[in-house]
Amino acid sequence: MGVFDPTLLILLALAALGIISQNMTVTLAILFLVAVRITPLNHYFPWVEKYGLSFGVLVLTIGVMAPIASGKISAGDVLSSFLHWKSLMAVAIGVAVSWLGGRGVVLMSNQPSVVAGLLVGTVMGVALFRGVPVGPLIAAGLLSLLIGKG
């Protein structure tokens, strides 16, 4: 890493976008990556790149499943989700989005040239529109439908 590090500048610009939009999730995530980049911890980037997404999905899944595990959502509530049309729609959409995410993983693996655009778009969506950073996989899945890959 030299005196002029364009990657660091991009990260700092994205962190500034997170600060301006008052999105602490984006800001903290990017500042964490900046800290890793400028310290000896940077040799962990291959590990973060390889396992970071899986770890993030694990944490997200824990957060989503916590109401069932805690009893806030009862077994009866889960079973009744197959009896109401809104819940059936939620199940169908969950299946569709999971399928799109799977296509997205394949596209991102096979065509790494699209990853930068997906990531920048996701960070912008999170920072500007209060989205959540699950966008790259779904965006890649949608892109795969448009370009016929995945």
Curated annotation (Swiss-Prot):
Signal peptide location: none
Q: How does it sit in the membrane?
A: Multi-pass membrane protein
Spell out where the chain crosses the membrane. 10-32, 51-71, 88-108, 127-147
**Alphabetized UniProt keyword annotations:** Cell membrane, Membrane, Transmembrane, Transmembrane helix
One GO term of the cellular component aspect?
A: plasma membrane
Entry's Pfam families? DUF441
Q: Which domain of life is it from?
A: Bacteria
Name-wise, this protein is UPF0756 membrane protein Dd1591_2981
The upper taxonomy is: Bacteria, Pseudomonadati, Pseudomonadota, Gammaproteobacteria, Enterobacterales
